[in-house]
């Protein structure tokens, strides 16, 4: 009997090390950044069983078999739709400013569609203003309303949006809502989905979360886009979730969330529409294709119109697209670069680009929250401050709430606004959306918003930062090492 137990023990030991060796080999064979690979290996060898389960659940980017099959089926029809869209040559910009030309060229070559001109664009800096405009647009909607959000939390003015959507559906407007399962977990636990469905609204839970699915698909892959489409000609996007900041996470100790949204009228709504349709088909298997731009209602030739390029990122979209776009934007800066983000955990390449911009004389400012709702990300962000300050980057810590706006302004001309945080999750993983605007007028509007953020922030003093307690440096470096996994 003792021999039997000895054999079993050796088999278990052999299987244990074989499993670790197999996962190690899998990590090494995957084409990934060295810091990410090293961080995963450290976790696996310090906490083997936990590390292996974590890696198999979160370490590799895969949609799952069903979504992958749907994605492969929808691309031919999507590609055909894009080819037909390109026949509307008058909607595409043929010239860009010097600072924006490299980025627009990159986007056109990688995504197959260039920047679209003739759009009217309005910045919304408060939740109340955004909801007021949205309620008016929903009331006037005649054909369709589509929405996708990471978080939808009932309460406050959000109830008015729900009521307005129900009224629109009852008068014959096709309404579809796509919400991330993890972000909108409270919404799906309440009666609101059934109330909307009874009224005729299609409500879909995207990327459902449960333990069984952890072995079929990466569970921290999230639908992080925020898009509203109305009658295929009006669109909203930006950093705002469908939550009233007066009631959202008020026990987190970070204050109200501060967001930025853009309201767009024009042909670029069609580009946002095809992205929404792809997301919808990937989740439901139902095909939707937006109609082409209506030349009778969209003023393509207006001199005041904005040229906008849409960047969609996530599984199934051009790899590293948003990361390349950010790098191109930073390297294009000649005079000034202003970035706002709630979560700052950049890649080594992006960190190097930002520092290099400051070192070659560009006035670089980064605005981040003073208090963060994510303790892990907050500590990891601080680990980058020393290198940034040494390069001459100005770091502003926003003190009037949790600054959730994601924006980049280059030389007052090139603007990027959307859902992308400057962290690994947004850069490499989640479904995200970004608007690229080549326009000095819009750049001036965005600069005013960013200057207001700076006025409500504290400039980080390099000398005081160097004198912070030693224990804080240790914690920062610890989280810095694991930053590729955050």
UniProtKB/Swiss-Prot annotation:
The chain crosses the membrane at residues 3-23, 38-58. SUPFAM superfamilies: Phospholipase D/nuclease. Residues 219-246, 399-426 form the PLD phosphodiesterase domain. It catalyses: 2 a 1,2-diacyl-sn-glycero-3-phospho-(1'-sn-glycerol) = a cardiolipin + glycerol. Its main location: membrane. Keywords: Cell inner membrane, Cell membrane, Lipid biosynthesis, Lipid metabolism, Membrane, Phospholipid biosynthesis, Phospholipid metabolism, Repeat, Transferase, Transmembrane, Transmembrane helix. It comes from the Bacteria. Its EC number is 2.7.8.-. The keyword ATP-binding does not apply. InterPro entries: Cardiolipin_synthase, CL_synthase_A, CLS_N, PLD-like_dom, PLipase_D/transphosphatidylase. GO terms for biological process: cardiolipin biosynthetic process. It is an enzyme of class 2 (transferase). It is found in: Cell inner membrane. GO terms for molecular function: cardiolipin synthase activity. The active site is at residues 224, 226, 231, 404, 406, 411. Belongs to the phospholipase D family. Cardiolipin synthase subfamily. ClsA sub-subfamily. Catalyzes the reversible phosphatidyl group transfer from one phosphatidylglycerol molecule to another to form cardiolipin (CL) (diphosphatidylglycerol) and glycerol. This is Cardiolipin synthase A. It comes from Pectobacterium carotovorum subsp. carotovorum (strain PC1). The gene is clsA.
């Amino acid at each position: 009997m003792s021999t039997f137990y000895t054999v079993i023990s050796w088999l278990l030991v052999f299987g244990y090390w074989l499993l670790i060796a197999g996962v190690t080999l899998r990590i090494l064979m995957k084409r990934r950044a060295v810091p990410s690979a090293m961080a995963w290996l450290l976790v696996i060898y310090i906490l083997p069983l936990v590390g292996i389960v974590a890696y198999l659940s979160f370490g590799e980017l895969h949609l799952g078999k069903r979504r992958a099959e749907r994605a492969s089926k929808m691309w031919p029809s999507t590609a055909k739709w894009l080819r037909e869209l390109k026949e509307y040559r008058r909607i595409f910009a043929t010239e860009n400013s010097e600072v924006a030309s490299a980025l627009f060229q990159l986007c056109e070559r990688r995504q197959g569609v260039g920047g679209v001109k003739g759009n009217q664009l309005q910045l919304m800096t408060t939740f109340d203003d955004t909801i007021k405009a949205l309620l008016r647009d929903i009331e006037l909607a005649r054909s369709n309303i589509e929405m996708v959000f990471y978080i939808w939390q009932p309460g406050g003015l959000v109830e008015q949006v729900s009521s307005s959507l129900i009224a629109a559906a009852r008068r014959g407007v096709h309404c579809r809502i796509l919400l991330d399962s993890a972000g909108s977990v409270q919404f799906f636990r309440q009666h609101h989905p059934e109330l909307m469905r009874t009224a005729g609204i299609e409500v879909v839970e995207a990327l459902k979360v449960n333990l069984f699915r952890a072995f079929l698909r990466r569970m921290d892959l999230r639908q992080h886009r925020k898009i509203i489409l109305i009658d295929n000609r009006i669109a909203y996007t930006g950093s705002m979730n469908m939550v009233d900041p007066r009631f959202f996470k008020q026990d987190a100790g970070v204050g109200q969330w501060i967001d930025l949204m853009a309201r767009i009228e024009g042909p670029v709504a069609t580009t946002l529409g095809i992205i929404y349709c792809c997301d919808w088909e990937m989740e439901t298997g139902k095909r939707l294709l937006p109609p082409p731009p209506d030349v009778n209602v969209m003023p393509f030739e207006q001199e005041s119109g904005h040229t906008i390029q849409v960047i969609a990122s996530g599984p199934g979209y051009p790899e590293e697209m948003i990361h390349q776009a950010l790098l191109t934007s930073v390297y294009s800066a000649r005079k000034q670069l202003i970035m706002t983000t709630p979560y700052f955990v950049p890649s080594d390449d992006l960190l190097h680009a930002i520092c290099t911009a400051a070192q070659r004389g560009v006035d670089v400012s980064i605005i981040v929250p003073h208090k963060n709702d994510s303790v892990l990300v907050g500590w990891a962000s601080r680990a980058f401050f020393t290198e940034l300050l040494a390069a001459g980057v100005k770091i502003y810590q926003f003190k009037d709430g949790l600054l959730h706006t994601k924006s980049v302004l280059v030389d007052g001309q090139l603007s990027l606004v959307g859902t992308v945080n400057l962290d690994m999750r947004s850069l490499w993983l989640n479904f995200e959306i970004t608007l690229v605007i080549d326009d000095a007028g819009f750049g001036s509007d965005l600069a005013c918003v960013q200057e207001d953020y700076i006025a409500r922030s504290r400039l980080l003093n390099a000398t005081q930062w160097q004198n912070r307690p030693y224990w804080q440096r240790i914690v920062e470096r610890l989280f810095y090492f694991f930053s590729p996994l955050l």
